[in-house]
Every structure is written in structure tokens, then in C-alpha cells.
């Protein structure tokens, strides 16, 4: 019998309100025994705090992940490799792991770096989409982002 490898799920927790987490994201958290969460140098885990508001985390293994806040590519790469090394034993043990991400997991998310590294090693990954902050802000302001035949305009500022 072939040994089962765990799946790394990138789970979007949305813009801060647990009620804006998708059903798919919440269900993913409920089924994964391991929850990986980015942790600040000061020890805060904002994405985990949001996910706890949605419930379903009792009895889960919480795996804090530290990511370097640097523009140095070598420092970032080392940080991503350390996170992969922290997650890999759980996947090797067949434990599905949910990695929490603020906003949507497909927009500037740390999950993408781990996804790329782990997929290159043959590990399966999947994503649970979320509500991006710009959509939540429009809803909060009760303002549509587009109307009629308008095309949305998205600007990304790389260097401020």
C-alpha cells in the first residue's frame, strides 16, 4: 500500500472579518489537522486570530511560520525554505495542512512561495479562495466597483 502524502492547502481568511471567510475555506480548516499560520517577530498571528473567529480550530496542531520582512531575495528565499522545512514533516506523515493567508490566497500571498517549492518536490497543493480587501472595501462603502460596460482598473504600486 502506498503511503499517503498530506496536501498543503492555501486558505484565504479574507480582509479581517471571520464572517467574510468562504464556506470552502472554513470547511478546509475543519478537515485539516494542522494549521500553519504566519507569525510576526512579536509573536502575533493575525490570520490565525481571524480564522479562530470562524470556529473549528479546537484540537488542531498550530504551526507558527516566520517569514522575513525583507527586500533581499536571498533572505526571502531562506525564509521560504525554512517554512517548507517546518511544514514538510506533517505532509510526510499524511497530515493535510492548511496555511492561512490574509485576503485572497492568490494575491501577493506567502502561500505561493511554499506552493512552488513543495510542488517541485512532488507534494500536492490546493487553494481555497477568499474575499480580497478591495472587494470588501467596496461592499463596506456600498459602492460598486464597476457598472454597466465599465471595465475595472487595478493599479499595483510596486515601489512607493
Where are these regions (language model features)?
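Short, catalytically relevant binding-site loops at active-site mouths
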Residues: 105-107, 132-134, 142
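Conserved small/polar residues in nucleotide/adenosyl-binding loops
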Residues: 158-160
